Amino acid sequence: EMHNPDRLMPEEAQKRLSEAKEGVRCQVCKSAVREAHAKAGEASKLPSFKDKWQRGSIVTDVVAKICHGPDYDKVNMGFFPTVAGNPPQWGEGIGVKQLKEGDKAYDKHPSGWKLFRYKGGDIEAAKERAAADMGLDIATYNVFTSALVRHVCRTVVDERQADDDLAELILDSLNEKPSKVIRDYCSNECASDTKARKSHWHDEL
């Protein structure tokens, strides 16, 4: 299943994935907007960006592709992606933990799901530990994590493009830090995290 490899996971893992999707909307939204803001900043250095008539379309293209991998155009033409699901490359450095009440991070992530970034060291060993903590084999964990970021990103960004102009928000704040865009765009996604509302703008991502 090249477009949705998570459908091949064991049924129990698929059920947990469905639960996790609701639990990490805020975290994925913030990460996606931060990545889009950074990529738009890189694009602003291109000669074509000096043309004010092209800026909008350049940033719109960045936003359209932020939840997808390098095969975005190829997939849209009907071809299979090189990597199953064509997940965004920035998601490769993200892991997921399932928390329990009493865990140190639970108060900040009352949904029971926490995303984190791998920081240096042996990333593969870190993934194996995270997989073991969730009771998954490493292959299933990798599919689970990739699918989680991919599906949620496309929900909070792609499905909102008709109603919320993220590209315009980013274009208006290119010379600023992304925090204001994140607050403005992700407020609805983060509001449901009621227990963590006072601190939900700070996390490891």
For each predicted feature, which ranges?
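Extracellular/luminal segments of secreted precursors and ectodomains of membrane proteins
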Residues: 1-205
